[in-house]
C-alpha cells in the first residue's frame, strides 16, 4: 500500500493543471531497486506514455501510476509535501523496502556479510571515493576483503579496517571472528590519504 498525503496530492494536482495535458498523471518507479543506489523516480505521465501494466491509484484530481515491476519495492511507501525547519517546502518519498531487506538470520554468513558491506559499509566509504569487496568468508568466520577506489593504497586503510569495518561486521553478523585485508596497497594509484603521509 502506498500512502500519498493530501498536501502531496494538492501539490501534484497544481503541477498537472499547469501542464494542461488531458489525462496526465504521475508515474512512480523504483530505480536500481534492491541495491544501495536504489531511488524513487516521479515523473509526469501522459496516457500515451503508459504501458498498461501500471498499478493505478486514484488521487484528488489525477492518477498516480506505479510501474508494475516497482510495486514490491514501493510497498509501504509514503509520499508527502512537507515544510522544513528553514521554511522551504519539499516533496519527500519514504520507501522502506526500496533498497531490499537484510537477509534472514538463517541466510548464509556470506550473504549476510555481503549485505552489510553493500548497504552499510560501502555507502560510508563512498564519501572518500572508496569501497570494499568481499573476497572470501572462511568457515571459521574470517572475512577477507579487498579495498578499491580511494581506499586502495590509503594510509588509513588499517584504521578503517579495524575500527570501522571489523567492528561493524562483528557487531552485525554473528559468527564473524575477524576481518582481514587482501589488498596490495602498494599498487593503489589514487589513495584518499597516501600511505607515506599517514604516518
From Swiss-Prot:
Taxonomic superkingdom: Bacteria
InterPro entries: Fe/S_biogenesis_protein_NfuA, FSCA_dom_sf, HesB-like_dom_sf, NIF_FeS_clus_asmbl_NifU_C
Binding-site positions, [4Fe-4S] cluster: 151, 154
Bridged cysteine pairs (disulfide): none
Keyword Mitochondrion: no
GO BP terms: iron-sulfur cluster assembly; protein maturation
Cofactor(s) listed: [4Fe-4S] cluster
GO MF entries: 4 iron, 4 sulfur cluster binding; iron ion binding
Note accompanying the cofactor annotation: Binds 1 [4Fe-4S] cluster per subunit. The cluster is presumably bound at the interface of two monomers.
Role, per record: Involved in iron-sulfur cluster biogenesis. Binds a 4Fe-4S cluster, can transfer this cluster to apoproteins, and thereby intervenes in the maturation of Fe/S proteins. Could also act as a scaffold/chaperone for damaged Fe/S proteins.
Entry's family note: Belongs to the NfuA family.
Stated name of the protein: Fe/S biogenesis protein NfuA
